[in-house]
A protein has these predicted regions:
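Mature catalytic core of soluble alpha/beta enzymes
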Residues: 2-224
Length: 224
């Protein structure tokens, strides 16, 4: 949260509820409703105690969609290891976590082409996580304009920063889950700068023209 400077904020629950990306006939939320939801957003209004959480704004609602799958994947991996499983893939849709290796070889994990259904890139992964956040995962079009599920907590609308997806390679899926969204919201330059400061984290950014950008050591994972 603090590294994103508010571009990523878990207190967007009211805003998330306004946008229905699963509707058969999607429609834009009312401008007044978005304005109202924005007043409930602000992670600095969260107070954590030993066993309780409170909000300075009683209308604030937390949404943990950006970390939930990663947390669950990590817990599944912990369980499998406890059961002495030494090779497995946990795939929660956009979140892939590998346990060990595949028959002594690395697992091959694809990154989806944002403009198609095939893979734009393949990675060799050993006992690590690969998480992607992209504008093609949940979206709709209204009057020719594209709206996706990664929402800007400052405007109430989808981010429009030239990025199509961000993929994070990490040891823990919860880290990759959060960082894929955080880095998307920061944009290419700031997002890559953040990743390059973090030990054990690599990233692949894809823009809306399908150009690829890599963190310092991400190409070490790419299958040529």
């Amino acid at each position: 949260l603090f590294r994103s400077n508010g571009t990523f904020d878990i207190t967007v629950g009211q805003l998330i509820d306004l946008w229905d990306f699963k509707a058969d006939t999607p429609k834009l939320p009312e401008t007044s409703a978005i304005a109202g939801a924005l007043t409930s957003i602000g992670y600095r209004g969260i107070t954590l105690n030993d066993s309780t959480i409170s909000f300075s704004n009683p209308n604030t609602i937390i949404d943990l969609g950006a970390v939930a799958k990663g947390y669950i994947a990590d817990k599944i991996k912990e369980y499998l290891i406890e059961q002495r499983v030494d090779s497995a893939i946990i795939n929660l849709g956009g979140n892939v976590l590998c346990v060990g290796k595949k028959n002594s070889d690395d697992f091959t994990i694809g990154i989806t082409d944002p403009k198609g259904s095939s893979d734009i890139l393949k990675l060799k992964i050993n006992d690590q996580s690969v998480v992607t956040s992209g504008i093609y995962q949940r979206y709709f079009e209204v009057e020719g304009k594209y709206y996706h599920h990664i929402l800007n907590p400052k405007t109430g609308y989808s981010y429009d920063n030239g990025l199509a997806s961000v993929t994070i390679i990490s040891n823990h899926s919860v880290d990759g889950d959060a960082l894929s969204t955080v880095c998307f919201t920061l944009g290419k330059e700031q997002g890559l700068a953040l990743v390059n400061q973090l030990a054990g984290i690599e990233a692949v950014f894809i823009d809306t023209n399908n150009a690829l950008y890599y963190s310092d050591h991400a190409k070490d994972y790419v299958i040529q």
